[in-house]
């Protein structure tokens, strides 16, 4: 911000901020005077020293309206400058904004521009940092003008000379010194900042730019081009920031009226020499204060010390120059001055940083004051402390309403004190503010009455740290309570993630009218019932409330009054109060309204009415069928008393899941007000009946099933069988491990199911443990398994922090917690439990950092327009596999989106949703149930084409209000919160399982999902006999081809219902054309290894398989069986030698039919020369299955890896074209894979030896198919399949981690917002005639604008007889040249020859979120994120302008954010009345908006 002499800082309305390098003139213009002395304050008077670092004359008075000497006191002398001490009479606040300066004796280089990477000064002068350093620190001279002596000696400009060389020339050519400095014949060489200043001043940037562009075009050397490009970037930055500003032309002179004379321009902006400082600015003294401590000492800011060093050295140097000290001494002093200024600007970069005397820590320089969490940006500008706030412990307030909170009186009186004082004075209870304060301190009873009136209708904000999403701050209506703890409504705990074990919360008071309106309309807790991350309700009853509702609505056979018929609901309640009917009794009630129920009510009549009352039975059945009588329980009638009429009668057992669905349904049907009322009612009912039920658990409630012993015996027998197989040599160690783990996993699940069933049947389902579990109040099946079944397998904690899963210990814990564990079992289980606790603390920080990066990358994504008009969309298909494996349903993916094209039911050929329509919850549910709709094209943020922000049609509905998103919604921040919040939650929840392993049982059988007809596609199978476990020989069909497919088709329509990929080596159980029923086994496969099978009969022949070289033989000491495993053979051979282990199938004559390469780690199953039948296993490649589930420790690093777009550790090699695979030559460390297509295009890939190749000779592959195993790199997907594919890949992969690892629901649109930001940039390939540079990383929008700018321009090839201002090779507007040509033709002169201007080309770039946040268009936002000094240096050099478009930069400069109610279009709103009489107008910028928002 600019202050000029005598003015105050700009406080007015500004819309953008420009960054540039400060010129000496601008530093002087900001300054109020020169600081000449290093002193701060006088040690006796404690008053600032004149001309010192705290001088009142320069920086302003230390006391309001009082000069230094005391001649002028009081405000009436405002603005007078004292004639005695020279201090202006004004407020002391000016000491926060007035600056001073230090005039340096010699120019000094600014360390930021010299030490930044790449060095800005180095790039302009074409000098390395090392050479620059030697010049700047007075080690060598640099030639500025070689002159005549230089020519004779062969010295050029920019050459470095040592002291000896310099003095040799000086003494040799003595008369040279007599020449003028600007004489071209004079030899001039200098050192230090002065030399750099002179060199920079003499640069011709335009000439350098032309030469560098020439190198770029013509040079063949890649290195030269890279260097030229690096330099050109800096040169162009200076040229762009130093553009002429055209003045208004008074009158034209000269013969050519169209010629522009150079005087008509003023140049402003950066000059290279500004990077060398002649004047150092001194920041205001209040920003580097001196604070008196007790004991008469002072604590000072480090900056004062650093400034002192500069002033002392500068004054000493001036004195030395005056007394004409020897050059050696001067040079040393100049170097010390340079170092002092370096330390002032950036002390942390230096190896020999200036340290403090006592504690020996480096002093904090100006750079350190900006950087990091404690720096100016993050500490003071983004996070401020707030007045009118307090904090206290929270306790539960069960009798509060949803929008209320209990505020302790002592806290309220403190927070609302000014308002109370005002009321007391207004009412005349107190005479003055002072007496009102006394009344408050005495706690006079009248004060409480006034306080009650003051807080009426005034909301307060409650916040619990950490505030991970927007529901972490909500508004409540305070009610005054005794005590010192804040009371919180139990239903808002989930949103705050609060519990009552000592948590604290902060209270804030919104002061202005606008803030109060926003708090009550937008932030009130009863308006925030839905989670923005998934659209699901967040105010869901839990624990006691759920238990109470469950107990109330549960039926018990044989309760008092069972089978009675009641005339009305009221009658039921009377009967219950009179104890004629029990709470759980099943009864009949006359009711003909809407009913939501699960069970078949007619069937219940036979159970409830005795056989002898046959007529009554028949009558009741007919009444029930006519929907006139309802079968329900007394408890359900009581529960439904609180139900809104519109919803009808809920005749279900209410558990947590049902309650959640019910609340979601209510909020969409009847709105927030009634839903909030209902929530308060069921809260009371829940707590009430939990108390009446009196549920508690004892040891006897945990029942261990008797069958447990039998199951464990079976498991022990099965695992012994596996060990026997292993001993026989038919299984590898890896397979043995996997199978044993499977056996125990199955047993554990079996015992768990039986113990669960046992609990369910105990006491008619009224076992307290079972009720807690079944209602969803507390506990999980997993915990019941550990309590009453067996603890099962335990995960061994992982050793690395990189997120690889730990192994499962194959010996399970057979005991459960009721029986008690043995010492060994206890030891094993402590292993996992401790890991959970340590993980929590380590990973919370990681999750928090992820959230911060997400916020930074997406903070400027705001809904700016209604419709961008794009025709593109996202293609979504129904995927049965994902839906059955518990992933996101088709319905969830399309819900709340706008259809990009008509969604059609292909069976009936009718349009279900028209293009441009919103797919509501009802429409989405209908589409889910309609098999005719297989796919849909929806509008998405990923394809939105708006230039700034996004459009509301592409985003779809706002999940928390189920309406199309409004203009100004900060969807980027909501996306970041929605992804970051569960990440943090997940890491905090790992230890609840107690470390028990939950990995999936490896599924070997694939079953039919639909009934239909089998169609086999590319499935080649052979008959193969195998010996089963029982020793019986069986014939099976084994698939010997890769990538075969099995389709299930509808026999009537021929439509494919489901596709399955049949793996290589699978046993197939069905034939082509066979009809199958649902759940019939189609094929089974071995999940633990990849098999290599013989496809034809013949004999095995080993090629390059040599014992001790390419394979090792391991003999099992117990079994004597030898296992052959291929090993990494490279270390065993000389550099020239190479091997490629493979097994060939040969005919009897020895002719090779087919060869199979065998990768490292594979186990051989045949001997050399063995006879083979089709389907025989030649070798197996073991797979590592990730079995440890339920722990996001593995998930969080994965999410980070995806968001940072990192290349995986061992990526797959991916084919870039469609074609056929062939293998080329083999080198020592790699082999060649070629992919060739029918058009003659060929790509060659080199695969490291030992990596498993998935493709075989002759395989057909598609572009993007992996040729080797490993994870596919997102960068490869972008390069080969384009931006759309990589966007879909990232969204799906991240979604998988959250879904599978943690069961957290996040709507796709949030992930899409982040992924969109990762693909915002393009890299320029060819710059064409635009002002871009090749290799530039720029915004897509900037790139399009640059191309549009040259679209209508032409380049002049031959100027013909054009006026002098038309130059060859330059760009001009087409219409101007056409006009000139017309005139030239008229005058029979030769015309101008032109060609169209070339446009730039580019390719999209995928950036990780950290890089994307640093590459943001906003300088302020990037600087506050990371690498502050680098960002500011680059911005200053390029003269960047921050347009303040995002949220962060506006918060930093103290403006309203351009989102929500702070949108610019709302700023000028005024409320006015149409009534004729006068009304008070609320002068507000956001009263109207708050209503518009709602």
From Swiss-Prot:
Domain of life: Bacteria
CDD domains hit by this protein: RNAP_beta'_C, RNAP_beta'_N
Cofactor note: Binds 1 Mg(2+) ion per subunit.
Residues reported to bind Mg(2+): 499, 501, 503
SUPFAM superfamilies per UniProt: beta and beta-prime subunits of DNA dependent RNA-polymerase
Chain positions recorded as Zn(2+) 1 binding sites: 67, 69, 82, 85
SMART domains per the UniProt record, alphabetical: RPOLA_N
Subunit structure: The RNAP catalytic core consists of 2 alpha, 1 beta, 1 beta' and 1 omega subunit. When a sigma factor is associated with the core the holoenzyme is formed, which can initiate transcription.
Protein family according to the UniProt entry: Belongs to the RNA polymerase beta' chain family.
Protein name: DNA-directed RNA polymerase subunit beta'
Organism of origin: Chlorobaculum parvum (strain DSM 263 / NCIMB 8327) (Chlorobium vibrioforme subsp. thiosulfatophilum)
Primary gene name: rpoC
